[in-house]
Amino acid sequence: MADLSALKEIATTAEPAAPVHVKKVDAQGRSYATGKRKDAVARVWIKAGSGKITINGKPFSDYFARPVLQMILQQPVVAAARDGQFDIDATVAGGGLSGQAGAVRHGISKALTYFEPGLRPVLKRGGFLTRDSRVVERKKYGRAKARRSFQFSKR
């Protein structure tokens, strides 16, 4: 009986091990992550720097001309209060501009957590680490589009 009570005591005092997040950086001091949104896939590298953001070799303000897309891109860095501290280089392909901006945002968020694991709770709370799984609904036969039916004529 003493053995059983000792085991119960060990079971109650032992805490489940929290996952340890280790900093993932390559030889050049960069963290790499991929982000996805709709049909777009972004490969993102971040390193400590002056805040320069490059998308497919162009400044992000040239690649994403609409201010809304530029804001989407900067959200994770601003939420983490690290504005102007990282140089971000991304290559993105597939989809349209909105999907590409979302993919780069997702990639930046993941790369930030690899570079600085302490930022994970802040970015998780903001919803930046969650992959947005919404994609275009497929077209069905017998219909004009996914849900729209052909025009109905009584006569």
Swiss-Prot record:
GO terms for molecular function: RNA binding; structural constituent of ribosome. SUPFAM superfamilies: Ribosomal protein S5 domain 2-like (SSF54211). GO terms for cellular component: cytosolic small ribosomal subunit. One of its GO terms (biological process) is translation. Keywords: Ribonucleoprotein, Ribosomal protein. Belongs to the universal ribosomal protein uS9 family. HAMAP family: Ribosomal_uS9_B (MF_00532_B). This is Small ribosomal subunit protein uS9. It comes from Rhizobium meliloti (strain 1021). The lineage of its organism: Bacteria, Pseudomonadati, Pseudomonadota, Alphaproteobacteria, Hyphomicrobiales.
